Amino acid sequence: MTPTHFVSVAALVTNEKDEILLVNSPWRGWEYPGGLIEPGETFQEALKREVREEAGVEIEITGFVGICKNVGKDIVNIDFTAQYVGGELTPSEESTEVIWATPEKAMELITFPLTKKRLQNMLSGRGEAALFCFRREPFTVVEDVHLPAGLQDNVSTA
């Protein structure tokens, strides 16, 4: 069997006011920036490229949030946190509008169920990695686990 997985990256990008970068996608409405990893790219290269293409800004990746998988289409999404470092908010073919929003406003604007679930994980995942699997239509979470990130105090490194 030939592998057929697609891998994407996305980020919760924040500014100095702790506002969240949102793009208005013609396909899914309001969401955080991200997209598919192109052949030969690293996770970091893909994420920085996607944010630049969709929002016109530069970022520094600051953390890992988690992974989710569409069990119906073999799509894997990897989520990160990032800090805005420069550039002007600029719409593109992939984003009709680009804004900074408070976390509360972001939760209100995002209506696509998968995007909202991932944002909840991004906002609450301090020190944990979120791993979940879902089916898209209707959106149903089939597995949802939050695991501590990194080594824990009860794990020996010797």
Regions found by a protein language model. Name each.
Residues M1-I20:
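Conserved N-terminal beta-strand and adjoining loop/helix that marks the start
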Residues S8-V9, T42, T96:
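Short loop/turn microsegments at loop-to-beta-strand junctions
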Residues A11, F64, F80-A82:
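A structural signal for short, well-ordered beta-strand segments
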Residues V13-T14, L22, A82, W100:
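Conserved hydrophobic "DFG−1" position in protein kinase catalytic cores
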Residues N15-E53, P148-A158:
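Conserved Nudix-box catalytic region and its N-terminal flanking loop in Nudix hydrolases
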Residues W30, T96-A158:
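Nudix hydrolase/Nudix homology domain
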Residues E58-G66:
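A short coil-to-beta-strand element that immediately follows conserved catalytic motifs
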Residues K69-L89, I99, P103, K117-N121, ...:
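Active-site-adjacent beta-strand/loop module that shapes the phosphate/pyrophosphate-binding cleft
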